[in-house]
Amino acid sequence: MENTKQKELQTTATFNAPLVLIWEAWSDPEKVVNWWGPTGFSTTIHEMDFREGGEWNLTLHGPTGTNYPNRSIYKEIIPLKKIVFEHFNPHFIATILFESKEGGTEIQWNMFFDSPEQFDIIVTAHKADEGQKQNIERLQNYIQQLLDEGKFQD
């Protein structure tokens, strides 16, 4: 059995919000654009064909003005349970699992890299772990904003 821990970045987060709202935040481009990317970044979504085989193309705009194009293909979507996408350049597979918990929702977000060397480059050199943590924080803040503004009804 292969040890994936040297090639995997895993984050778990709990939200005080219903699963359907968290799912919408991941599946609706009008919501994704409000939280995707590390702190200080903005996002332009060029295409988000949220279906298995669909493309997700976006540009992250860094705080210094640098643009970072991103391309992914959705590999598996199980409504309200699971999203898997393949990201290119750098290559990794992302799996996001959604689960209702008492009083909220838990997500588990895994990124699987091709090799320990690629993991080291992306996670250690480019701080992907910190970026993923900031993405979660931005999502937490966005969800809270939607709830506070009454923009989501169960």
Language-model segments: residues:
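Short, highly charged C-terminal tails/helix-capping segments
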Residues: 142-154
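Beta-strand/loop substructures that line and gate deep hydrophobic ligand-binding cavities in soluble
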Residues: 86-134
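Glycine-rich portal/gate segments that line the openings of hydrophobic small-molecule binding cavities
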Residues: 43-85
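Hydrophobic pocket/interface hotspot
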Residues: 22, 32, 56-58, 74, ...
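A short, structured loop/turn motif at beta-sheet edges
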Residues: 19-20, 50-51, 75-80, 97-106
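Intrinsic-disorder/low-complexity, polar/charged segments enriched in Ser/Thr/Lys/Arg/Asp/Glu/Gln
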Residues: 6-12, 19, 43, 55, ...
